[in-house]
A protein has these predicted regions:
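N-terminal, positively charged/glycine-rich alpha-helical extensions of SAM-dependent methyltransferases
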Residues: 2-46
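Conserved SAM-binding loop of SAM-dependent methyltransferases across substrates and taxa
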Residues: 84-96
Length: 234
């Protein structure tokens, strides 16, 4: 995810320059930074928070969809943090039997996504405030939600990741996919969330499910994890 300029308050909270000081929770800070991308870059991969190329964005969509175990059977999928709904564009270009729903905290992104895909379902919700009324889905994908942390300190970002994963996992019947920045890099950026394998695995394995797969075999300096309720083959 991309970035803005941040202002630190006397309480140690960080707010994007130009944003309301009330915007201080991790989810609202990250959402505000992404909305700045939307304003700056419009309907493009940069407007959705990707910094490299359209190809890298497309690669990530395929990685997210790789969580689906049986690609031949119908499945419902929640695109959590859907942004402009570009994953739905990808699904329309590469058809599969997937019932798509998009969800985002940002009203600006949801408004734009609904204009782009008027027949699709999009939900505007902050699930950390309340997930009441959010249906369950076969699969949930969280693409790019945890890559960027801006001025949020590491421990706060870690707790945010744990909290959001706990809530979202309640709403997947089969599995979910998420990505984070890798620690296996030449150098780390202070504004990105580089999550160690063992920290990730300890939480996922003890709090969510011991049935998970780590994908670290693609070009980006990140990794994708698939978490399943049941072991493979069942």
């Amino acid at each position: 995810m991309l970035v803005g300029q941040y202002r630190q308050s006397g309480r140690g909270e960080y707010t994007p320059v130009g944003a309301s000081p009330a915007v201080s929770t991790p989810q609202h800070l990250i959402s505000a930074a992404c909305e700045a991308d939307l304003i700056a870059h419009g309907d493009s991969f940069r407007g959705a928070g990707y910094t490299k190329s359209p190809r890298e964005a497309e690669d990530r969509y395929e990685l997210m969809l790789g969580v689906i175990r049986d690609q031949r059977s119908p499945a419902s999928l929640l695109d959590f943090g859907c942004g402009l709904g570009h994953l739905l564009d990808h699904l329309q270009q590469h058809p599969r039997d997937i019932r798509y729903t998009g969800l985002d905290l940002s009203a600006k992104y949801i408004e734009a996504a609904r204009r782009r895909h008027p027949a699709a379902e999009f939900i505007q919700m902050d699930v950390l405030e309340s997930d009441a009324g959010l249906p369950d889905y076969d699969y949930v994908v969280l693409n790019g939600l945890f890559n960027y942390r801006g001025g949020i300190d590491y421990q706060t970002m870690l707790e945010y990741w744990r909290s959001l994963m706990t809530v979202v996992y309640r709403h997947c019947r089969i599995g979910l996919a998420f990505n984070v920045m890798s620690k296996i890099v030449d150098w780390e950026r202070d504004d990105l969330f580089h999550l160690p394998f063992d920290t990730m695995a300890e939480f996922v394995g003890t709090k969510l499910s011991r049935h998970f797969v780590i994908r670290h075999d693609y070009r980006a300096y990140e990794y994708t994890t698939y978490v399943y309720r049941q072991p493979s083959g069942e």
